[in-house]
Amino acid sequence: MTVAKTRTETDTFGPIEVAADRYWGAQAQRSLGNFKIGWEKQPASIVRALGVVKRAAAEVNMEMKRLDPVVGKAIVDAAQEVIDGKLNDHFPLVVWQTGSGTQSNMNANEVISNRAIEMLGGVMGSKKPVHPNDHVNMSQSSNDTYPTAMHIACAEQVVHHLIPALHHLHKALDAKARAFNHIIKIGRTHTQDATPLTLGQEFSGYAAQVASSIKRIEMTLPGLQELAQGGTAVGTGLNAPVGFAEKVADRIAAITGIAFVTAPNKFEALAAHDSMVFSHGAINAAAAALFKIANDIRFLGSGPRSGLGELSLPENEPGSSIMPGKVNPTQCEAMTQVCVQVFGNNAALTFAGSQGHFELNVYNPLMAYNFLQSVQLLSDASVSFTDNCVVGIEAREDNIKAALDRSLMLVTALAPTIGYDNAAKIAKTAHKNGTTLREEALATGLVSEVDYDRLVRPEDMTHPG
């Protein structure tokens, strides 16, 4: 007996053949043919989130006596398999589809319907006893389901991946700040010599940037935790029973362990995604901070003989195919590339967020994809940068001291005693003649050897006073 390679699925456009071993149905199959665009698939976190929505909706519909318990239980079980990632291979659709995410919502409805039918001993594609629209999509619309899945996926990834990764980086930078606090170095402003500080103080600034980034991102979570579910097509809640929105948000919170709530205004939740733009803005700010930190570290580690050479960075791999022995700041370069990608994602996401024409924003898959890519890249890069660079950074104290000793900006310590103009003249003369500050200061007769040695003490210039 020959096993059929396809089965016939139907929708309102008629029949279509689907691979027999695939759970998706007619609408997902049509999407595969209609949107042969790019290689970017719907993120696995969105697929998981759609499973969460479908499970929560089925549980609430059963509780409200709208869904037969046998059908509902099968939907819940099938949706849980989606949540667990067991059915990821059955979600083949690309990002570039209808802007409401309708095809992906129907992909979820069809997969869960067919898997539930299979669990109940029925025939896949028959839509009996579990219908993808009537049962799996009960009390829902793609217009509230996909935005809800967006918020679930983005919040979960921020909470479980990005914030822990940034904490990991902060801990390492803070440890370096404490380890380097005794090392006095010359500061630089406008890339030119400035007054001294400690290397630990410099690293404390990096640690503070990361800590502030975490706080700013956490401030945006309440917006992501507001869910559109229950607004259905245009925000009115048509075909969803009274109380469904609140109950389904409670179920989603219970399933995910994140304090999701129903959005107070469903018209805003469907037509605008300002909370996504706001949250990604904080992520973008974190990328700006990480770009600065990675840049500073690679410049401070430049050399080893002809650069600043204040830091020694871990040597992880050969750096050149032509120059033997060359080692490059590869982790810094990877981090800065990631940050540039996040900047680009922020521009795309900001524009997409502005396109809520009338009652619905139709850039949802793009917004979700860019947001989630930023979170994954920054999370991964933060861990990689920490483990393969930051923890192994060492100070080159001999180079740091040499640069400090020859800096002309130590003259700043004399200004309160001999005046700004006289101090500036000493610095310029020393630079012109190639002499030391001490020599030129004593030559002016404005300060004695004892006073110079008392006033120009780098260790006293790293704090107020």
Curated annotation (Swiss-Prot):
Site (Important for catalytic activity) at 333
Active-site residues? 190, 320
Principal localization reads: cytoplasm
- One GO cellular component, as annotated: cytoplasm
What is this protein for, i.e. what is its function? Involved in the TCA cycle. Catalyzes the stereospecific interconversion of fumarate to L-malate.
Q: What is this protein called?
A: Fumarate hydratase class II
Enzyme class, UniProt record, top EC level: lyase
Q: Which Pfam families match?
A: FumaraseC_C, Lyase_1
Catalysed reactions, semicolon-separated: (S)-malate = fumarate + H2O
Subunit: Homotetramer.
Protein family:
Belongs to the class-II fumarase/aspartase family. Fumarase subfamily.
Q: Where does substrate bind?
A: 100-102, 131-134, 141-143, 189, 321, 326-328
Cellular location(s) = Cytoplasm
- Source superkingdom: Bacteria
The protein's GO terms of the molecular function aspect are: fumarate hydratase activity
| GO terms (BP aspect) | fumarate metabolic process; malate metabolic process; tricarboxylic acid cycle
Name the Enzyme Commission number(s) assigned to this protein: 4.2.1.2
Q: What else is known?
A: There are 2 substrate-binding sites: the catalytic A site, and the non-catalytic B site that may play a role in the transfer of substrate or product between the active site and the solvent. Alternatively, the B site may bind allosteric effectors.
Matching entries from InterPro entries are given as: Fum_hydII, Fumarase/histidase_N, Fumarase_C_C, Fumarate_lyase_CS, Fumarate_lyase_fam, Fumarate_lyase_N, L-Aspartase-like
Please give the pathway this protein is involved in.
Answer: Carbohydrate metabolism; tricarboxylic acid cycle; (S)-malate from fumarate: step 1/1
Classification via PROSITE patterns: FUMARATE_LYASES
Query: Which Gene3D superfamilies does the entry mention?
Result: Fumarase/aspartase (C-terminal domain), Fumarase/aspartase (Central domain), Fumarase/aspartase (N-terminal domain)
Q: What keywords appear on the UniProt entry?
A: Cytoplasm, Lyase, Tricarboxylic acid cycle
